[in-house]
Amino acid sequence: FISPLRQLANIYNAIQAALAGAERVFEVIDTAPETEDIPGAVGLEHLKGHVEFRNVDFSYEAGHPIIKNMTLEALPGQTIALVGPTGAGKTTITNLLTRFYDIDGGQIRIDGHDLRDIRRAELRRALGLVLQDTFMFADTVMENIRYGRLEATDEEVMEAARLADADHFIRQLPQGYATVLSERAANLSQGQRQMLAIARAILADPGILILDEATSSVDTRTEARIQQALLKLMKGRTSFVIAHRLSTIRDADQVLVIKDGEIIERGKHS
């Protein structure tokens, strides 16, 4: 009598798990494809990194604005720090710059070109991202770094790791650069994963850099090492930095305080 009931309970659990998985699959299937480049879209040869937001409006849902009439300018090589409470719109600003979403009004310009007039593939190649939680593949350390520029040589990969202050810990791994990481690099510390992410960005050599809470999940000692690697990465590049820690934003050329999708204060840290 008990055995059929157990089987029924197991079947019910399996069905529930399958439904949850199916829901995620349908979300992917229902995702709208990105719009194609317009005819005559331009490239970004000789990128300088001059970024402008001109009266930009954006909402994920109609009638619920997230970014409101935002105007900002980053000159080539400048570092712009975006600070503010959670949900203020900081990450949305960088999502608009990468053109993960199209704006509702206003203009975003890079080197004088409207973002919508730039070939999307070239725009993405010009941008480098270091996020709070960077995805790593179940592959070797070498190939995970090479993902930043697939045609890079082994020597270029190792040089990027040296600049990111990652070479030392990599060589201490069981097979060095040939060490295979587990899914999402669970066999590395958070700080080590961030150093690999920085090495990946250095290898990509982007003209514009986006750092989204890149040091928020590490201890202060590890943060100091990562911060030094980030300074090398940011040198000469237009950079947008989202952070709460003072150490990350104190050298920024501009600090923009964001609240409810608007810039409520701007200046330099002093």
Tell me what each language-model feature is.
Residues D37-G40, L44-S270:
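ABC-type nucleotide-binding domain
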Residues T31-A32, R184:
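Short cytosolic juxtamembrane segments of multi-pass membrane proteins
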